């Protein structure tokens, strides 16, 4: 035994001496240098010419490092470590200082990185940091980013970073100056290049960073980190490649969480533009990107004209960039655009509309555009533009102008310019009689009916069955009936055995299914066309069928009409046949036949139009017969898939008028050349449009079952609807009411082979819109026979809903069963008890405040996760009992909870602040068999800025436990 102890003592002495020697060794500059070089060669691969200092405070000089095709160099790197933090939960670096950092992006790095660098699925655990790492102060005198196309310099950068779990939190960041310049061209005043020369050189550059190429090689990846930027302020931004060096001041507050970039504040200040913006960018799992930005812009050069606008953009999986810009301050100016990013010539279409756009030329001189319409479409090097507007100058008559032209990267050609003054017309006010006002002051919509609905959800299978739809509506004094049934399954399948829409004597019938494959059959029988279209008379029958799948639809239709008459245009008979089959090869045909047509004073005896086309050949025939005019044309054509050229010829030309006859020889050729498009691209676009349509249908389907996605649940209810809306001419909807009633609602959920059932005998929801105020009342009765037990009563009002949006509401839960919590969690095996609560809502719709007072009695919970919830009150024990799976029970005889929630604003930043006060005198927890712990507790949990404060006590029979935890993070 003594020998054993002797060996142990010698081993302890040996390791103690070794530790002291190793500690003294790394404390010295020489020792730290050897240790750093040894570990660096094995793990990091960083090269440093000079190393000084020790492990607590060291400096690296002339650093070189290559990662992911990016070359990083720096003159020096100085790091200071807080040694006391090594004995705490967080590791703190007091200071990190760099000098002259250069990041060089090599050629083809973007494509190589997208293909090889990241795995298809990234687990969050790879980037999970259990214990926080804090970089307290980071200072860089200069950071230079270079690429084959651009150079960006950041001067005097000051920031801080906190790494915890999957979160990266940036402290308020300051950048003194940002310089942006081109890496290819030097636009100095001494050497100004010709514009055409620049464009030619630009066209010769290889498109290394083509956005379409980069996005097309991407697989679905989720970014596993959440990034929070409290604030970023840039004192000056300078673009040094241009003749006028514009200076900008930029301030930014943003964060990235769950693939959503939330921009809380973006402020740009310059001599020519001042802008405040906020919004968000969503990176979807299918690699599409959605963006919504709201901005307020002030233009000093236009006498501080203030403009509020909203930008909505979407980059979808078909590489189409769709955007919409709306500004109400510019009198409803709208800009809609579509850009195809998967083609080298970038086809696009942009449309601008504005009414009464005004611009201040001088302080008391205004330039107005009464009606402004613009179109820009084509390709980046071959586009067409059209501008039509009416503009006025002060004291001058309005002038109409029409400009059309085309252009490319080098030139702009004007094809047509027309302008002429418009004669002024005097407008007289029309007297509106009271009966006319009453006509427009009626309810535009009245809806009443009943719906039976049942549903079921079992993990990944969901059903909603509506066996009875019985709705009756009155739209602008026109009656509408909706009768039928609907079946919905698993987010991607909708089927109806039949739905009838009755509009007066007109009937629309729908039958079929919509899913991965769809079969939709519809028919229209309209004998009363003027029911919705005044002055339109006649009869019409139609059948339209959609068959196939998402990519290759088959569409067929047959439309027959008789005695159509509208505004001096009369058709005796019309027949339209259509057949389209987009399979591996496109084919389509259409036939239009009409006879005895009266077009004002012109009479047409017969009109016959027929077309047929596929991927390679096309045929078009046109026949018109009348007393004064006879036209017969037959054109055959073919597309060349390789060149994109179309070649056609007239098989027949015969035109006869009262002046004489015009004929031509056969095989008169016509050609169309377009180097930017081919018929193959056209059909690919058609297929992509079908994909977009299918994707739209899928996104429209509601995610109603997401809340119950983990376990089996079903519901059944009978719902009645009564609604009406009133519209005053020239104003918004002024009055309206919606009443919903439900009877015998049954909820059923299966957890761990055990079934939970809850019945709601009756619920009633009424919503009223009276002028600018929205008011609603809610009544939910679990047991209709018990007047005061197991009920929910309340109201929610929004005052001045179009402007101030102030909210006021109150909900009362009276002796409601606590077992309802089983429908929101799967962790509890058994729950019982009752609670009653009063919840008040106030504030505004955008800044709501909540006050909830909850009283509970005889609460019993059985679960194997109770210890996990209890440890939430002790942050240092988090995660220590996660693997304990035993039967645990908690009983609370009586207690109350007070919950408050309100928005918090500080230094122009917004956050949510909430507080929970818990108080119970009799609590017992059964942890192990025959081990019961009894205690009382009074706790207060406060949340603000992602941090928690917990203050209170837990009182046991033998001892008293005081809690005072502040600024901790779950």
Swiss-Prot record:
Record-stated family: To E.coli YtfN.
Cellular localization per UniProt: Membrane
Primary localization: membrane
GO biological process, one term: protein secretion
PANTHER family: TRANSLOCATION AND ASSEMBLY MODULE SUBUNIT TAMB
GO terms under cellular component: plasma membrane; TAM protein secretion complex
Keyword Iron: no
Chain ranges passing through the membrane: 12-32
Annotated protein name in UniProt: Uncharacterized protein BU087
């Amino acid at each position: 035994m003594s020998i054993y102890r002797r060996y142990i003592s010698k081993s302890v002495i040996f390791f103690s001496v070794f530790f002291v020697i190793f500690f003294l060794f790394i404390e010295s500059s020489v020792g730290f240098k050897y240790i750093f070089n040894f570990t660096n060669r094995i793990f990091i691969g960083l090269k440093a010419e000079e190393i000084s200092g020790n492990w607590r405070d060291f400096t690296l000089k002339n650093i070189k490092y290559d990662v992911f095709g990016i070359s990083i160099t720096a003159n020096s790197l100085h790091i200071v470590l807080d040694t006391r933090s090594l004995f705490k939960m967080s590791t703190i670096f007091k200071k990190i200082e760099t000098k002259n950092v250069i990041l060089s992006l090599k050629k083809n790095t973007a494509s190589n990185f997208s293909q090889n660098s990241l795995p298809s699925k990234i687990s969050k655990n790879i980037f999970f940091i259990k214990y926080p790492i804090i970089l307290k102060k980071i200072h860089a005198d200069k950071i230079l980013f270079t690429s084959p196309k651009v150079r960006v310099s950041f001067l005097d950068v000051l920031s801080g970073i906190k790494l915890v779990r999957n979160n990266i939190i940036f402290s308020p960041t300051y950048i003194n100056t940002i310089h942006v310049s081109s890496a290819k061209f030097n636009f100095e005043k001494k050497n100004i290049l010709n514009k055409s020369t620049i464009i030619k050189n630009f066209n010769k550059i290889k498109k290394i960073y083509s956005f379409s190429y980069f996005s097309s090689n991407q697989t679905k990846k989720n970014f596993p980190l959440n990034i929070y930027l409290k604030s970023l302020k840039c004192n000056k931004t300078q673009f040094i490649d241009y003749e006028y060096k514009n200076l900008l001041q930029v301030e930014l507050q943003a964060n990235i969480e769950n693939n959503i970039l939330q921009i809380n504040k973006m402020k740009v200040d310059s001599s020519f533009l001042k802008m405040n913006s906020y919004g968000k960018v969503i990176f979807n799992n299918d690699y599409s990107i959605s963006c919504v930005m709201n901005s307020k812009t002030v233009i000093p050069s236009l006498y501080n004209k203030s403009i509020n606008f909203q930008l909505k953009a979407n980059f979808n999986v078909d590489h189409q960039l769709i955007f919409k810009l709306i500004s109400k301050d510019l009198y409803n100016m709208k800009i809609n655009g579509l850009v195809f990013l998967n083609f080298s010539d970038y086809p696009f279409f942009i449309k601008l509309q504005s009414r009464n756009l005004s611009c201040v030329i001088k302080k008391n001189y205004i330039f107005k555009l009464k009606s402004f319409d613009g179109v820009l479409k084509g390709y980046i090097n071959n586009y067409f533009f059209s501008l039509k507007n009416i503009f006025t100058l002060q004291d001058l008559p309005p002038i109409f102008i029409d400009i059309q032209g085309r252009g490319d990267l080098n030139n702009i050609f004007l094809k047509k310019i027309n302008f002429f003054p418009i004669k002024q017309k005097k407008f007289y006010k029309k007297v509106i009689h009271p009966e006319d006002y009453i006509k427009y002051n009626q309810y535009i919509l009245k809806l009443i009916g009943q719906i039976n609905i049942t549903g079921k959800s079992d993990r990944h299978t969901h059903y909603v069955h509506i066996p009875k739809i019985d709705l009756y509506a009155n739209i602008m004094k026109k009656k509408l009936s909706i009768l039928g049934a609907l079946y919905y399954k698993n987010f991607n399948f909708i089927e109806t055995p039949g739905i009838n829409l009755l509009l007066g004597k007109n009937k629309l019938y729908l039958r079929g299914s919509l899913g991965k494959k769809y079969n939709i059959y519809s028919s229209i029988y309209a004998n009363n066309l003027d029911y919705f279209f005044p002055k339109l008379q006649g009869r019409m029958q139609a059948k339209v069928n959609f068959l196939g799948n998402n990519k290759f639809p088959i569409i067929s239709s047959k439309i027959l009409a008789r005695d159509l008459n509208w505004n001096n245009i009369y058709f005796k008979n019309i027949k339209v046949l259509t057949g389209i089959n987009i399979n591996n090869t496109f084919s389509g045909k259409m036939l239009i036949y009409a006879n005895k047509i009266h077009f004002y004073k012109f009479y047409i005896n017969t009109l016959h139009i027929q077309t047929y086309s596929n991927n390679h050949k096309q045929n078009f025939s046109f026949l018109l017969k009348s007393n004064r005019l006879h036209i017969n044309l037959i054109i055959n054509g073919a597309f060349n898939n390789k060149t994109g050229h179309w070649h056609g010829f007239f098989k027949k030309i015969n035109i006869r008028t009262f002046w004489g006859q015009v004929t031509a020889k056969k095989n008169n050729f016509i050609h169309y050349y377009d180097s930017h498009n081919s018929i193959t691209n056209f059909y690919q676009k058609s297929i992509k449009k079908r994909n977009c349509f299918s994707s739209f249908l899928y996104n429209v389907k509601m995610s109603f079952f997401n809340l119950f996605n983990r376990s089996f649940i079903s519901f059944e209810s009978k719902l009645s609807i009564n609604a009406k809306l009133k519209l005053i001419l020239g104003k918004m909807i002024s009055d309206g009411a919606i009443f919903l009633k439900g009877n015998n609602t049954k909820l059923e959920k299966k957890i761990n082979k055990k079934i939970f059932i809850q019945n709601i005998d009756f619920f009633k929801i009424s919503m009223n819109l009276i002028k600018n105020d929205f008011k609603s009342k809610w009544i939910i009765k679990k047991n209709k026979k018990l007047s005061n037990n197991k009920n929910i009563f309340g109201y929610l009002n929004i005052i001045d809903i179009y402007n101030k949006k102030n909210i006021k509401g109150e909900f009362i839960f009276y002796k409601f069963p606590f077992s309802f919590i089983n429908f929101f969690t799967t962790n509890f095996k058994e729950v019982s008890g009752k609670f009653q609560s009063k919840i008040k809502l106030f504030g505004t719709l955008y800044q709501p405040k909540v006050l909830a007072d909850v009283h509970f009695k005889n609460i019993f919970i059985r679960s194997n996760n109770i210890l996990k919830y209890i440890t939430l009150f002790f942050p240092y024990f988090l995660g220590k009992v996660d693997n304990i799976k035993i039967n645990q029970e908690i009983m609370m005889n009586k207690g109350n909870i007070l919950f408050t929630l309100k928005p918090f604003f500080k230094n122009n930043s917004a956050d949510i602040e909430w507080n929970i006060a818990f108080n119970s005198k009799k609590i017992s927890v059964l942890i192990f068999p025959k081990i019961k712990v009894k205690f009382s507790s009074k706790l207060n949990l406060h949340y603000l800025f992602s941090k928690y404060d917990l203050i209170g006590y837990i009182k046991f029979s033998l001892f008293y436990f005081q809690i005072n935890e502040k600024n901790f993070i779950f």
